Amino acid sequence: MFASNVVVLNKRSIRFIQTQLPVKATVDMKFDLHLPKRSVIGKLPYHVEEPIVFVHGLFGSKKNYFNDCEKLSNLLQTPIYTIDFRNHGETEHAMPFDYETLTNDLIHFVEKHNLKNPSLIGYSLGAKVSMLALLKQPSLFKSAMIIDNSPVVQPEIVPFLKVFRKACVETVNKAGIRADDKDYRAKANQYMSKFIPNAGIKGYLLQNCINKPPKNPSPVINYNDGMIHWKNPVNHMANVSEENVADWPTIPEGIKFNGPVGFLRGTKSDFVLQKGRDAIAKLFPNNRIFDINATHFILNERPSEYVGIVADWFKTGRHDVEKLAAKKAKNAQL
């Protein structure tokens, strides 16, 4: 169903190989592994207990937060895996692109790499995928930090997502920017200003703008046509990168994750409203919500502050929540 979403523009601007995206139940996601540079316990084994998997947002990639994960790995003395979702970064292009499929990809990654008691750090799109993974396979995961998202349907964000995708599509299809133009990124930035005035958001999206073929070939993009391109198959992601990202599946009654889950909420963001907090309390009873003075783009606006909050959560905060939950359970039995 999703693979037929091909956007055809006028003949002058068509630069895509006219084939559909393949449909795959799961894909092997590309990843980077961040190990502590100096370990207090000597040489750290590759498969240590309780590694962390960092899960990026829409149009993000494992490269976005390289420095953050290096810092967290050293602060927490544990390996951190950063992944690329399908249709992102270095991972292959394929459909479907929905929460059920992305969650299955994440669970497949954890099981394939034999990760023992991993925890998750999920941001935005990656936050919802992380939450669904906790609910689908609660015994597989130890804990999580969910960054600025909640387990609810969010139709209010669809208009913004449509603008983001339109800006990406029109920049590669209508701006006429050649790959050999040394100012290609600056020109792409200028063109995107027609749709997105915010410099931070443009910078985030432009990390996907390339003038050379990437490591992963795409069945739908001709990277050798002399023009700039996006790493993501944006022309083939109409609707799925909007309605599906704003969606949230129906969770059967009684399903919950009882492990400790931290939620980092931007006070200038609308991604964790009261309906979201109610859903969090129901599905993740052993939670703690942290506020940070930022919009939804917390990781770009408050990098040092959010890294500190995340590190403190995994060092001590989650254990405090576990102790409190155990105390409540004991009192309930009396």
From Swiss-Prot:
SUPFAM superfamilies listed in its UniProt record: alpha/beta-Hydrolases
Interval spanned by the transit peptide: 1-16
Top-rank taxon: Eukaryota
Family matches, as Pfam families: Abhydrolase_1
InterPro entries referenced in this protein's UniProt entry, alphabetically: AB_hydrolase_1 (IPR000073), AB_hydrolase_fold (IPR029058)
UniProt EC number: 2.3.1.268, 3.1.2.1, 3.1.1.-
Protein known as: Ethanol acetyltransferase 1
UniProt organism field: Hanseniaspora uvarum
Lineage per the UniProt record: Eukaryota, Fungi, Dikarya, Ascomycota, Saccharomycotina
Name of the gene this protein is made from: EAT1
